[in-house]
Amino acid sequence: MRPIVDLDHTSGSPTSLLRTFVGLHLRDLGGWIRVAALLDLLATAGVSNSSTRSAVSRLKGKGLLIPDKREAVAGYRLDSAAVSGLERGDRRIFTYRGQRDDEPWCLVSYSLPEVDRSKRVQLRRTLMGLGFGAVTDGLWIAPGHLRAEVEDALVGLDVRDRATIFITQTPLTAEPFAQAAAKWWQLDTLAARHTEFLRRYEHAAPLSENSAPLPENSAPKSSLEPREAFVLWLHCVDEWKAIPYVDPGLPPSALPSDWPGMRSVELFAQLRRTQAEPARAHVREISSAES
């Protein structure tokens, strides 16, 4: 199972921005882009040509991009094997799924011997990347709606026979459940990520204290030119994309009263509605221009 998002990525780095660009735009372009257009677009976002070429080399090595010359024009195409991973990423990044207090939990218990230490490390990273919290070394917990994803992950890592999945109601903890959840998911660290996202991007789509998400069928317009919207949206998604993997959408009973997550989820949705389409239009324009 190919990783969708590198949880250790440094947002804003050339490689991270290129990965974000590929995920946002390359499928919309038919899976291929001219080298010159790619360099131009990433330069607009603040990435030098040399840095973009180095980042492309890394993604070629990971099997994401493939050199492909068309009618004597040098370009890169998306590896077809990467499409399913990008689609899974779309679902996690752009579709927020919050758990209600009356919904079940998914627990995963596993036991791997020392001889399988590398696989054990990989499994832990995978569980973290799915939004599971660590109750103990071999017991992890997440909202019940992640059951199918973790089942696929266990099969993909060839450890399904070493793990047991439990679907249960709220665990009975000795301390208040919210205190236990804060430790299992390291909520202080996660809250800091949400707060930083708000700090960086709330100026682009200010939210009032009582604001509500706009209806899905509404069509708010960006106040930015398409070129500016492209830069804003690329950096915004690059900053945001890892958060939904470590924040599984915990219910109110598991969160502190001042939890910033819902405001940042709302902000990201607002930015998507205002910036995504003009950003897409800019990419299409540059990509279709003559070399």
Question: Where are the model-predicted features located?
Answer:
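Mid-protein regulatory/catalytic core that forms ligand/cofactor-binding pockets
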Residues: 114-207
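Short, Lys/Arg-rich nucleic-acid/phosphate-binding segment
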Residues: 69-75
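Short amphipathic alpha-helical interaction segments
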Residues: 47-58
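Short acidic, hydrophobic short linear motifs in intrinsically disordered regions
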Residues: 29-41
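Short, amphipathic alpha-helical interaction segments positioned at domain boundaries
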Residues: 83-106
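C-terminal regulatory/effector modules of DNA-binding transcriptional regulators
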Residues: 179-291
